[in-house]
């Protein structure tokens, strides 16, 4: 039977990490936490569990996750964020995969919680993620904000039953602050990669972002929460491309 290393990166996750670690009990053979020098109680909560706790300066989400993979003792990896946890059904599904590992990686549906409600649409569910994989067959790639584990060509991918539970925001204010921060990071990453934006680009992405998430993806079926999520998404897309255009213009002046 193959052994599994759970790998998590953290920074000030005292409100979430305990639940995440509890959900891994009895499922994985090792838990590796790579922490970016948290200033809250993240470290002491982790050390109450059977965790290998490593401090490492933050390099961006993609690079930090690749560094964390290098610290794992086993080749089969379960990658989680600190604000995620395994549902009971997903726990059972991972144990079955562990007993009969037939794929290079496994997809899982992620279910997101927002201000008292599990979101069913709004492009937030099923929110498919590749989180269980054989590490030698891929790596974390793409942009640092939109990183994903990329398997090599020809890799076989299976599907796990159950949901990966996700608590991405603690409040409306937290949602607003994080989306603003993600817009800035996204614009900077796009600029580094050579992307450009015209005067129309922010409006196109902002309007289409709302239409896609609220209408096409059924965000209206999530009620008031769906409207808030889709509105924030639209505003974030607009701000990201507005800042990208600003960065493009500043670069031309140099």
Indicate where each model-derived feature is located.
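A conserved acidic beta->alpha catalytic loop
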Residues: 23, 27, 35-44, 81
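Catalytic-site signature of metal-activated, phosphate-bearing donor transferases
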Residues: 66-69, 76-80, 87-251
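N-proximal low-complexity "stem/linker" segments adjacent to membrane-targeting elements
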Residues: 1-23, 254
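Short, well-ordered alpha-helix to beta-strand connector turns
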Residues: 28, 50, 72-74, 154
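Residues at the starts of beta-strands that form the adenosine-phosphate
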Residues: 3, 29-30
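Glycine-rich, basic loop-to-helix element that forms the pyrophosphate-binding segment
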Residues: 57-72
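Acidic helix N-cap motif at the loop->helix transition within catalytic regions
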Residues: 18, 40-49, 89-90
């Amino acid at each position: 039977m193959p052994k599994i290393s759970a790998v998590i990166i953290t920074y000030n996750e005292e409100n979430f990490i305990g639940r995440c670690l509890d959900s891994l009990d009895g499922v994985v053979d090792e838990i590796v936490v790579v922490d970016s020098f948290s200033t809250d109680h993240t470290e002491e909560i982790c050390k109450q569990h059977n965790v290998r706790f490593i401090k490492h300066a933050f390099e961006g989400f993609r690079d930090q996750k690749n560094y964390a993979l290098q610290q794992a003792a086993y080749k089969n990896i379960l990658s989680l964020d600190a604000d995620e946890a395994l549902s009971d059904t997903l726990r059972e599904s991972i144990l079955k995969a562990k007993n009969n590992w037939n794929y290079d990686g496994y997809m899982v549906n992620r279910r997101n919680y927002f201000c008292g409600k599990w979101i069913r649409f709004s492009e937030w569910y099923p929110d498919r993620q590749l989180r269980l994989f054989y590490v030698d067959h891929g790596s974390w790639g793409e942009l640092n904000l939109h990183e994903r584990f990329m398997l090599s060509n020809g890799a076989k991918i299976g599907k796990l039953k159950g949901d990966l539970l996700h608590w991405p925001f603690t409040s409306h204010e937290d949602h607003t602050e994080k989306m603003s921060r993600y817009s800035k990071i996204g614009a900077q990453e796009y600029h580094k990669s050579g992307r450009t934006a015209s005067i129309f680009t922010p409006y196109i992405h902002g309007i289409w972002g709302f239409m896609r998430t609220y209408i096409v993806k059924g965000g209206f079926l999530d009620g008031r929460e769906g409207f808030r999520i889709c509105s924030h998404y639209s505003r974030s897309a607009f701000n990201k491309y507005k800042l990208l255009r600003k960065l493009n213009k500043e670069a031309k002046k140099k």
